[in-house]
Amino acid sequence: MELENIVANTVLLKAREGGGGNRKGKSKKWRQMLQFPHISQCEELRLSLERDYHSLCERQPIGRLLFREFCATRPELTRCTAFLDGVSEYEVTPDEKRKACGRRLMQNFLSHTGPDLIPEVPRQLVSNCAQRLEQGPCKDLFQELTRLTHEYLSTAPFADYLDSIYFNRFLQWKWLERQPVTKNTFRQYRVLGKGGFGEVCACQVRATGKMYACKKLEKKRIKKRKGEAMALNEKQILEKVNSRFVVSLAYAYETKDALCLVLTLMNGGDLKFHIYHMGQAGFPEARAVFYAAEICCGLEDLHRERIVYRDLKPENILLDDHGHIRISDLGLAVHVPEGQTIKGRVGTVGYMAPEVVRNERYTFSPDWWALGCLLYEMIAGQSPFQQRKKKIKREEVERLVKEVAEEYTDRFSSQARSLCSQLLSKDPAERLGCRGGGAREVKEHPLFKKLNFKRLGAGMLEPPFKPDPQAIYCKDVLDIEQFSTVKGVDLEPTDQDFYQKFATGSVSIPWQNEMVETECFQELNVFGLDGSVPPDLDWKGQPTAPPKKGLLQRLFSRQDCCGNCSDSEEELPTRL
């Protein structure tokens, strides 16, 4: 192995481990980078922010935590949030323990003799729930009670929250979230691979130590290929989807030469690598079923947003540190308008559904076909319609897809064969997932009988394989072919409109999750003693001006550090 590759891998592994220090990869100036503004600087934000309970108190992670802190100051609200947490726990409880969990909820929160009776609950509804619980504890037993509890919290309690120091603190976090993002927000590490318009490399947020993958789209290459619409479409779809099973977009920014998408870093490699380069081709059935179930959940989340993926194949399914999968590369994904169909002969040969090959109209059926192809390949160790490393013309592959039934070996159990054959139905109207029930039809297949999808969706099931934390599951640095220089293309001022639409900075939910996961929220979210208002949250006070530097300090010290400055001597090199 070349010295350059050894050094690049060593530096990346050290960064993934948190740099070996107490700061876990954070810059030594991270508190300065994430310093709260005085609340008076958030006035415009306060006036413009939409007052939506679901968005501010449920969907946004920091908003949810701060609303819970507010509720903890009032006993009647504490009971409501404790009930909601109890319902969440009930929904992911294993089947055999769910009835006992439901009884505890009924006794604690819904009984007149219970210690934490929640307010404004119709007694008839409680009685119905108790009866249904004894008949059979279904996962959605408390759905209506949950809705009513949120409805109660969204009225007077929500209005009181908006006038509290907890909401003011939320405004400070939102102010930080909306600060400009530049290349200096990150440290850059080794190249991991290539995308359609440029390299993909590992990167790390200086302020938090969080690792990501940075997908660079070279501006000249985009312009030469007229790829502006495709690039913006991928960015906007990634921004819209919030799923445990689809890579998340955390930041979008621009440099002089490139547009950059900062995405979830998946250290475990892709399924193509694991199917074909980790011993005998293919997986044991249990492992293939686990991945198929997680992919099904990812497709369900995409389809819920009316997005058809259209490029499901092994190399686009990535593993994280723990062995869970995420769908990646949404360049061919497209939104399907409500009540309409779309048309487009796009995808990868061997994974395109018959209706796509025939250039017919469709909605979400191509994704369920591709899931069948992928499940088959994971079990058989080869694609259903083309053998690995065997050259076969595109026309012949497409003929097989349209006309010839796939063959099954004894590696397939009867249930695995049943699911594959139903997903690989040539007629989309008969295909599993396309009969009116969507993902629910697929989840209810007997092959998934032993899987608790609620627990799977919460990340509570142990994956069958965990990647080696000391391994780099990608090609050597020198084996990744470099892009040639784009010639004959000039960037013009009119291109800036497109760049501004693309480079929108931080994405709310992933950014807030980053603050929570890296413990920045926990360390910075401090209020005054005994509930007193800290100076930075006092509307009557004024921002404290930083002390003036002396002449010698201004001459010899570095510029004050904001979130976008380069870091000090503790930083690692940005390019190897």
Swiss-Prot record:
It is found in: Membrane. Expressed in the brain in striatal neurons. It is a lipid-anchor. This is G protein-coupled receptor kinase 6. GO terms for cellular component: membrane. Interacts with GIT1. Residues 186-448 form the Protein kinase domain. The modification Phosphothreonine is found at residue 485. Its EC number is 2.7.11.16. Keywords: ATP-binding, Kinase, Lipoprotein, Membrane, Nucleotide-binding, Palmitate, Phosphoprotein, Serine/threonine-protein kinase, Transferase, Wnt signaling pathway. Specifically phosphorylates the activated forms of G protein-coupled receptors. Such receptor phosphorylation initiates beta-arrestin-mediated receptor desensitization, internalization, and signaling events leading to their desensitization. Seems to be involved in the desensitization of D2-like dopamine receptors in striatum and chemokine receptor CXCR4 which is critical for CXCL12-induced cell chemotaxis. Phosphorylates rhodopsin (RHO) (in vitro) and a non G-protein-coupled receptor, LRP6 during Wnt signaling (in vitro). Belongs to the protein kinase superfamily. AGC Ser/Thr protein kinase family. GPRK subfamily. Residues 53-171 form the RGS domain. It is an enzyme of class 2 (transferase). The modification Phosphoserine is found at residues 484, 566, 568. Residues 449-514 form the AGC-kinase C-terminal domain. It holds the Pfam family RGS. The gene is Grk6. Disruption phenotype: Deficient mice show significant altered central dopamine receptors regulation, deficient lymphocyte chemotaxis and increased acute inflammation and neutrophil chemotaxis. InterPro entries: AGC-kinase_C, GPCR_kinase, Kinase-like_dom_sf, Prot_kinase_dom, Protein_kinase_ATP_BS, RGS, RGS_sf, RGS_subdomain_2. GO terms for biological process: Wnt signaling pathway. Signal peptide: none annotated. The active site is at residue 311. GO terms for molecular function: ATP binding; beta-adrenergic receptor kinase activity; G protein-coupled receptor kinase activity; protein kinase activity.
